[in-house]
Amino acid sequence: MSKTLVAYFSASDTTKAVAEKIAEEEKADIFAIVPEKPYTKEDLNWKDKQARSTVEMADPNCHPAMAEKTPDLRAYKTIILGFPIWWGREPSIVDTFLTSADFAGKIIIPFCTSGGSGMGRTCERIQNIVGKDAKVMEGRRVGGEVSMEDLKLWFDGFQEWN
């Protein structure tokens, strides 16, 4: 078992592709954060105020159920966490993952995929969810075509996890 877990949520496979690239390069274990009820195209229509994703993101207490239980995190030192940016932050299903386990003593390295939006205050939000006993590193927005070389340069900046 690797000391690193790449956990990701991907609605359109963009984040999945980046997560798989990272897991392969870092020889990390991988876990897909999958909602119990998959999102449809209609659920993801951000222009529709009644769309499932819009309703979920408007409710700070919304924690959609996950299809699988979070893996036992005790053996992992580092969690590389990937997700798309929705409404300027991590999707509610990622919050479900973050509240489903104890992240004390873990290093969390977030990355997001987005057509243009950056991380904003997402890292602060994640830190507030997991608590002060976990260390959330500065996140980064990446495109679907990001090179592993670029990711390695970013990762190498985090001395604690190497």
Question: Over which residues does each language-model region extend?
Answer:
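N-terminal beta1-alpha1-beta2 submodule of the flavodoxin-like/Rossmannoid cofactor-binding fold
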Residues: 1-81, 88-90, 95, 99, ...
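Short glycine/serine/threonine-biased micro-segments
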Residues: 80, 103, 114
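Short, surface-exposed, polar/charged, turn-prone segments marking secondary-structure boundaries
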Residues: 33-37, 57-62, 107-110, 125, ...
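Conserved helix-turn-beta segment immediately C-terminal to the redox Cys motif
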Residues: 100-106
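Short beta->alpha junction loops/turns
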Residues: 11-12, 84-86, 115-116, 144
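Short, glycine-/small-residue-rich phosphate/pyrophosphate-handling segment
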Residues: 109-146
